[in-house]
Amino acid sequence: MIRIYTQQTQGQAWLSNHQQKSVVFACGLGFTDTALIPNISAAGATPEARKYTAIADAECICHGFREKAIYPLPPLIVGASPAILSRAILSHYQIPAYLFDTGLWLKPDKNAVDCIDVSGQKARCVSTGKALEFSTVNKLFEQGLTWGETLATQYLNHLFVLGECVVAGTTTALGVLTGLGYDANQKVNSSYIECNHDLKWQIVQTGLKKANLNPNPDPFAVVAAVGDPMQIFVAGMAIALSRTQGVLLAGGTQMLAVYALMERICKYHSLDFDPKNIAVGTTRWVAEDPTGDTVGLAELIGEVPLLATQLSFQTSQYSQLQSYEQGYVKEGVGAGGLAIAAHLAYGATQAELLAMIERTIVPYLAAN
């Protein structure tokens, strides 16, 4: 059910060390105005719908299907929200979940989303070169560290799955990786069946040109220029957690960018973290996406093992799930990481995961 794509020895050691540990899920919700650019993301069929994607996904995570959802899941171009996959696993195994508003389009209604406000702000478009205030980046990082320390004390000897929900987050990931000096062009993924590399690259290049960063920039300055609020918050949380706990950064390109950011922050600001406790975990739809190069990107960053669940929807009776097999949607809201954790911690099989996901999706399909 789990395949190691990079850093085989380290990946095997990480898997062995975290078998049968209880799981805690934490997810950084954020927004970047980059999501409003036409054709930048398929996570919401229109720019207007994409304003609410993270909030609707969070309501799904918190409550599952509700006939009168305050923020209904937005229509996608094809497929079904990955929040449905995450909700199925969280609900079935009663995994504690913490959702953090790092900077959303709007403050969610408390009756819809039980999330923790960490006083962030939504990001401006990457193309501005001024995505976030430096002070906001600093504050979000400190909040991440504090929450990581708090959760590590509350849940001893657990596996922490850290997810994200940021529409257009692969573009901010490309921005941060490029700003840190990685040659990530043509390597990131997308919610589209064919990754829109040229559009992403054009946006990133415009932003970096305006930002005019130093040759060896402070990683906080890189996030302030072309990043998003989730990245810096989750980086802080993962750094703190890694000192004593197992951490699975649940995502593809976006979490590889978070790992690269963590590594650079610790080096630049002389902080400690334990790379042995960290892996990046995603779906095979991301890891094997022929229109990106997640494996190449992981190898470029080095050190961190890239894992992917081998979960398959080929035999699903629902076309919305089968569309994942055709390259649509692929990942989000920690879905791949939670599937990995479900197998590691609770021995979940392919048949069991498919059954629980299909049970969870039925009321959504009936309502539409």
Swiss-Prot record:
Transmembrane stretches, start-end: none
Top-level taxon in the UniProt lineage: Bacteria
Stretches of the chain forming a coiled coil according to its record: none
CDD domains: DMB-PRT_CobT
Family the entry assigns: Belongs to the UPF0284 family.
PANTHER family from the UniProt entry: PTHR38811, UPF0284 PROTEIN SLL1500
NCBIfam families, per database record: nicotinate mononucleotide-dependent phosphoribosyltransferase CobT (TIGR00303), PRK04447.1-6 (NF003373)
Protein name per its UniProtKB record: UPF0284 protein SYNPCC7002_A1742
Top-level taxonomy: Bacteria, Bacillati, Cyanobacteriota, Cyanophyceae, Oscillatoriophycideae
